[in-house]
Amino acid sequence: RGTVKEAESHDADVILKSFDAGKAVFHFDNREVAVPLKLRGIYNIYNAAAALTLTRAVAAERYNKKTLLEALGNVEPAFGRGETLMLNGQPIELVLVKNPSGFRLALESFPPADYATMIAINDNYADGRDMSWLGDVDFESLRELGVAQVTGIRAYDMALRLQYDEVEAAAVSTDIPAALQQFIDSHPDSPKRIYCTYTAMLKL
């Protein structure tokens, strides 16, 4: 308990200082700590900072910092949330997207450099039927390399949205399995990343 003024002036228990692929730096207990992470995406890193804060608050003086950081570093990505699969020696990253803020953060979290990119958009009930939110996503980060494959029920709507941001879509198909195979065959030696809605991900 405390006054509103006291609550407003309370220093953050955990501060996320920086992050990049495979590592985040947090400031807590008056020092900066670099933590190797299996999680990807800034939204997952925010969740990691929240988990550190909650655990320290609940456990108070009883928490073991070494054990806590090791446990955090061993957390695996949830299905499709930055999950990485290996195929023929190359990674395929699955990035679930379901709203404009999530898609924007995903694009910010996963730089397109050196990656072949595919986007799979369905509008089934579990995805949400209204895909107009794609208009609120900035796809300019994909402009330089373009998108290798666009697929899903709303493939042509997605391709049109990319065109508005001057992002080239090399191939467009509503047939997800066929599009996936073409994507893999066309980029055998490249790491790959697929942004997908929920039911599109289940088809991959």
PLM region descriptions:
Residues 1-100:
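Adenine nucleotide phosphate-binding catalytic loops in nucleotide-utilizing enzymes
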Residues 50-53, 57, 105, 109, ...:
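Alpha-helical scaffold segments in soluble metabolic enzymes
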Residues 78, 90-91, 96-174:
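Active-site beta-alpha connecting loops in nucleotide-dependent enzymes
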Residues 47, 51, 148, 194:
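Residue-level signal for inorganic ion chemistry
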Residues 43-44, 98-99, 154-156, 198-202:
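Gly/Ser/Thr-rich loops at beta-strand to alpha-helix junctions
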Residues 58, 110-115, 183-191:
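Glycine-rich phosphate-binding loop signature in dinucleotide/nucleotide-binding domains
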Residues 16, 128-129, 180-184:
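Short, charged, surface-exposed secondary-structure boundary motifs
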Residues 178-204:
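A glycine-rich beta-strand to alpha-helix segment
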